[in-house]
């Protein structure tokens, strides 16, 4: 007798529930992002304040690990703070602070009421001729230059001259709540509109829910000090399969080149003399990677680039008795990272030029804000106590004065009183060896720069402006008054370097090109993504050029955009276009009379052809190279060093800002209870259905299964 066969597959009722659950999950995954977009408005153009650490402490800001949320309150005048600090009934508050109120006094008030402050969003102010803002300290790089309590104590800690007199030190404070910069005016308007629609009460009364809120994510992984975070990272990387590094040292590369090529595979002979021309590449502000640095960095390194171009055009440079080295130091803002590393490498035979090879040292400080024709020559009074050094410095000053004699737009002036050097890379070299050196700057005492190391040290700060009717290409080639003034300084510098190198025949024919200066200023301060910058870079570096200005923060990923662009700008301005093919350019060792020990070779995009249809790539041969700008403290694992910079940057998982409407605590509690009740009810229903599945869901007979 035939019988029906019993099925051994999954229970049909359970299978139905699984399919239902899968459908719900799938719908959630598909619609989750859509729901999130309807709830939150992301703020995409923001810059956070992040945590930095050194040997002794931490500075900067952070949010809690899950982000900080607060009801938005707009503070347009100081009286508006009262609502945030005492009167407002719905703390914590997310303060939308007008840029002009981002001061030490107001920040101290907010810092003292952390239980009522969830965070801060700062808008961009519009600086005027009388305003000032510098979040840096009044004595930059204090303790890491040449002056100390044991050497030149009368000059230590800026006792005689507060170089950054307007500095409020905010960038070196530690804040327990997140602080973001709102860079987009349209996003700021959206936030203010949300605030006006939902957070303004009637007749002085408290506003009703829902309220407009903001959430900021900027949780930092590192705490306490560099020594602590580096030790934790070291332990993680040693014993963990998936190590979680919590901080990284600030580092990048110095850019350097020689007037005459040298063999970089070995060191120079002791009797070879080198004149050093130096400046810095980096700046910073209170906010991460917002460092326009127009006066504090860009004007000086643009001037040096133009001077290098002018000097290389002199007909007899290959026969000069002395060589000239152009150096662009990275990380000088953070206790002289770049210069201290180069000195360390020179002392330890890791750099082709040694300290004993240095004949003289000329550094460009801040040079774009001359209030008159004067350019001041700063020297070190301590090293000049040595009679030999004093005579060498005197010769150096005389040479500079003579070089400026035929450029009436620049008057080189000596200081009338004994004064310390301003913050400068020269100080790190003087710590290692007495050399004749000078720092050229637009100030005799305190900085003229009212926005030193701030978000407002922009093109406008050094009067780089353009007619409104011009196209970007016309702006690129428009020679501004600032470009002309800096070209004059570059001419004086180039002529001085020529004379210091032993040149005599062509001094007056050396002339910096204002067109070069104006293109560089436009590219670094206004629009990096321009036709000239594109033509001088490799094809794979195009993405480094943004439609806005470049930022000059040293960071931890290197080389940075600024380093690359300066490297290639210097190579194109001072190098020679060869007829090598792309393959030969990338491997010149196979080409007769070409040497990687003497030169660097770069295959760049080149200019457009006459029809503007394709570029004409070319191989540029130059002496431009990169040298590591990582503090020796990290090479030596001396994370608590007081000799070298120990600055490190914390890592983070997510940087995010968004606004949304928030319900009252009571409604949130009710929603939670209702949701929990629904969950419990659904579990009970699911249990009951599953328990009665054999009754509710009857398995169908298999076709053809018949009993007789």
From Swiss-Prot:
InterPro entries in the record: Ncstrn_small (IPR041084), Nicastrin (IPR008710)
GO molecular function, one term: ATPase binding
Keywords from the named record: Cytoplasmic vesicle, Disulfide bond, Glycoprotein, Membrane, Notch signaling pathway, Signal, Transmembrane, Transmembrane helix
Pfam family, one: Nicastrin
Annotated disulfide bonds: 49-61, 139-158, 194-212, 229-247, 585-619
Topology of the protein relative to the lipid bilayer: Single-pass type I membrane protein
Post-translational modification: N-glycosylated.
Residues of the signal peptide: 1-34
Family under the similarity heading: Belongs to the nicastrin family.
Role played: Essential subunit of the gamma-secretase complex, an endoprotease complex that catalyzes the intramembrane cleavage of integral membrane proteins such as Notch receptors and APP (amyloid-beta precursor protein). The gamma-secretase complex plays a role in Notch and Wnt signaling cascades and regulation of downstream processes via its role in processing key regulatory proteins, and by regulating cytosolic CTNNB1 levels.
Name of the protein in question: Nicastrin
Organism in which the protein naturally occurs: Rattus norvegicus
Gene assigned in the entry: Ncstn
């Amino acid at each position: 007798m035939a019988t029906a066969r019993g099925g051994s597959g999954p229970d049909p009722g359970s299978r139905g529930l699984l399919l239902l659950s899968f459908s719900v999950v799938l719908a959630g995954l598909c619609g989750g992002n859509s729901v999130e977009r309807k709830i939150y408005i992301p703020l995409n153009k923001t810059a956070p304040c992040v945590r930095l650490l050194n040997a002794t402490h931490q500075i900067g800001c952070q949010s809690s690990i899950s982000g900080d949320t607060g009801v938005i309150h707009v503070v347009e005048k100081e009286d508006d703070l009262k609502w945030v600090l005492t009167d407002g009934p719905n703390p914590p508050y997310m303060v939308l602070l007008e840029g002009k109120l981002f001061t030490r006094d107001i920040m101290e008030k907010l810092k003292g009421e952390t239980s009522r402050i969830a965070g801060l969003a700062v808008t961009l102010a519009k600086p005027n001729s009388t305003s000032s803002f510098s979040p840096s300290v009044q004595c930059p790089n204090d303790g890491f230059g040449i002056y100390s309590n044991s050497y030149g104590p009368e000059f230590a800690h800026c006792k005689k001259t507060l170089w950054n007199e307007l500095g409020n030190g905010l960038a070196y404070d530690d804040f327990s709540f997140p602080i973001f910069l709102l860079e987009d005016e349209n996003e700021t308007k959206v936030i203010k509109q949300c605030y006006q629609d939902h957070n303004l009460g009637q007749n002085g009364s408290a506003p009703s829910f829902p309220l407009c809120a903001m959430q900021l994510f900027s949780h930092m992984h590192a705490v306490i000090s560099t020594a602590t975070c580096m030790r934790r990272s070291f332990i993680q990387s040693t014993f963990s399969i998936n190590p979680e590094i919590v901080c990284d040292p600030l580092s990048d590369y110095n850019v350097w080149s020689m007037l005459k090529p040298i063999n970089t595979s070995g060191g120079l002979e002791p009797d070879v003399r080198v004149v050093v021309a130096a400046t810095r590449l980096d700046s910073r502000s209170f906010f991460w990677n917002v460092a326009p640095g127009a006066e504090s960095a860009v004007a000086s390194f643009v001037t040096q680039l133009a001077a290098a171009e002018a000097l290389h055009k002199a007909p007899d440079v290959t026969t000069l008795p002395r060589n000239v080295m152009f150096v662009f130091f990275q990380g000088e803002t953070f206790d002289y990272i770049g210069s201290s590393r180069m000195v360390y490498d020179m002392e330890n035979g890791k750099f082709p030029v040694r300290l004993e090879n240095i004949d003289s040292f000329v550094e460009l400080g801040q040079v774009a804000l001359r209030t008159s024709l004067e350019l001041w020559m700063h020297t070190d009074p301590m090293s000049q106590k040595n009679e030999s050094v004093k005579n060498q410095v005197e010769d150096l000053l005389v040479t500079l004065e003579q070089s400026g004699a035929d450029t009436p737009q620049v008057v080189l002036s000596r200081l009338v009183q004994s004064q310390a050097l301003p913050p400068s890379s020269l100080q790190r070299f003087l710590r290692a060896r007495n050399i004749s050196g000078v720092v050229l700057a637009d100030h005799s005492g305190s900085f003229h720069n009212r926005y030193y190391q701030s978000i407002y040290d922009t093109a406008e700060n050094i009067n780089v402006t353009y007619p409104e009717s011009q196209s970007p290409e016309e702006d690129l080639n428009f020679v501004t008054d600032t470009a002309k003034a800096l070209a004059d300084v570059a001419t004086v510098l180039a002529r001085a370097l020529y004379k210091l190198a032993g040149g005599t025949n062509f001094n007056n024919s050396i002339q910096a090109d204002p067109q070069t200066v104006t293109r560089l200023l436009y590219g670094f301060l206004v629009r990096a993504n321009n036709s000239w910058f594109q033509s001088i870079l490799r094809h794979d570096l195009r993405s480094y050029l943004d439609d806005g200005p470049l930022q000059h923060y040293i960071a931890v990923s290197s080389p940075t955009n600024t380093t690359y662009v300066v490297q290639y700008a210097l190579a194109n301005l001072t190098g020679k276009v060869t007829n090598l093919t792309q393959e030969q350019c990338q491997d010149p060792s196979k080409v007769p009379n070409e040497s990687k020990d003497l030169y660097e070779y770069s295959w760049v995009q080149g200019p457009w052809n006459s029809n503007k249809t394709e570029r004409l790539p070319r191989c540029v041969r130059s002496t431009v190279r990169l040298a590591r700008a990582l503090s020796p403290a990290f090479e030596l694992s001396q994370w608590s060093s007081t000799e070298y910079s120990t600055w490190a940057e914390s890592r983070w998982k997510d940087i995010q800002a968004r606004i949304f409407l928030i319900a009252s605590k009571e409604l949130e509690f009710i929603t939670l209870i209702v949701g929990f009740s629904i969950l419990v009810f659904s579990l009970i229903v699911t249990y009951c259905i599953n328990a009665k599945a054999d009754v509710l869901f009857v398995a169908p007979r298999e076709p053809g299964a018949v009993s007789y």
